[in-house]
Swiss-Prot record:
GO biological process, one term: negative regulation of protein catabolic process
Locations listed in the record: Cytoplasm, Cytosol; Membrane
Keyword terms: Cytoplasm, Guanine-nucleotide releasing factor, Membrane
Pfam family, one: Rgp1
Name assigned to this protein: RAB6A-GEF complex partner protein 2
Purpose: The RIC1-RGP1 complex acts as a guanine nucleotide exchange factor (GEF), which activates RAB6A by exchanging bound GDP for free GTP and may thereby required for efficient fusion of endosome-derived vesicles with the Golgi compartment. The RIC1-RGP1 complex participates in the recycling of mannose-6-phosphate receptors.
Residues passing through the membrane, by range: none
Main location: cytoplasm
Listed InterPro entries: Rgp1
GO cellular component terms, semicolon-separated: cytosol; Golgi membrane; membrane; plasma membrane; protein-containing complex; Ric1-Rgp1 guanyl-nucleotide exchange factor complex; trans-Golgi network membrane
Amino acid sequence: MIEVVAELSRGPVFLAGEALECVVTVTNPLPPTATSASSEALAWASAQIHCQFHASESRVALPPPDSSQPDVQPDSQTVFLPHRGERGQCILSTPPKILFCDLRLDPGESKSYSYSEVLPIEGPPSFRGQSVKYVYKLTIGCQRVNSPITLLRVPLRVLVLTGLQDVRFPQDEAVAPSSPFLEEDEGGKKDSWLAELAGERLMAATSCRSLHLYNISDGRGKVGTFGIFKSVYRLGEDVVGTLNLGEGTVACLQFSVSLQTEERVQPEYQRRRGAGGVPSVSHVTHARHQESCLHTTRTSFSLPIPLSSTPGFCTAIVSLKWRLHFEFVTSREPGLVLLPPVEQPEPTTWTGPEQVPVDTFSWDLPIKVLPTSPTLASYAAPGPSTSTITI
């Protein structure tokens, strides 16, 4: 029996273009007092990163596979295929790297191997939606002699920041370590430089604050004014807004605001409703605020953007956008006043009206959500940083 442990050195969340580092430890768990005949051997081990794509058949109409391209996937269980047994199709993969060959371990002995690979920058982000799913995994394949391959899969979460594809790593002193007493290899320099550049771009895009005001009205007049200080956010930030109802001519009885994502299938891949398809647009609510606001002059709300959510993106098949979805309940009666008189000549019981004629309407405000630091996003990652398998 051999135990294989894969541990990600920095957590399971990465930015596309960063270098993933994983330590693979192979151990013979028998006690050292066992006989030498209890030694274990592995023929080889290899590692590869791949992205698996899966689409809902009721929502997405994918083109049929090209019959001129034969299926070259072998049926043999002795061939290393990282996506073997996975749902969907592999749309992106890195070249496989061999970790070791002809490894023999005595009882109680263990050996560790380091795997490093740059995550492809041209791929989609990790996403589990109602129409499509993009799932990244690091797969480690191990094989005994004359035995099938055993696969160890480590789930990953990949964040994509648009605009880094065209950035070139400078080959000069601009990327030198901040301390002259520290030495970094070329890969470490590039990885830290890319993370620093991404942080600077995210800070520049999300730190600009300027008050934006929107007049809210229905067909009968002005309801109020909505104010928001910015429209670009990072994962983990709060969307803060204010609502001024004191200037409205139409009484607002209640309002709600929801932080939502809109997943939309591209027109060329939408399945027709008559062919058993479902709507090509789906919405997910991540946070919601509701308030009864009759006689309220000014109010505010704060909606947190979950660290575990996916920033907005667009591929050839699907797009994901963020928005604030407002719903207002207004009175049909002009000048609605439901306050008791200031002076009461005698004891009086005051009750609200049993029925109020109302109208409802909604409004959507698009916002932009960008990734955040992979280290910060790791706190919300559902997957562990260590995976184990026994052969």
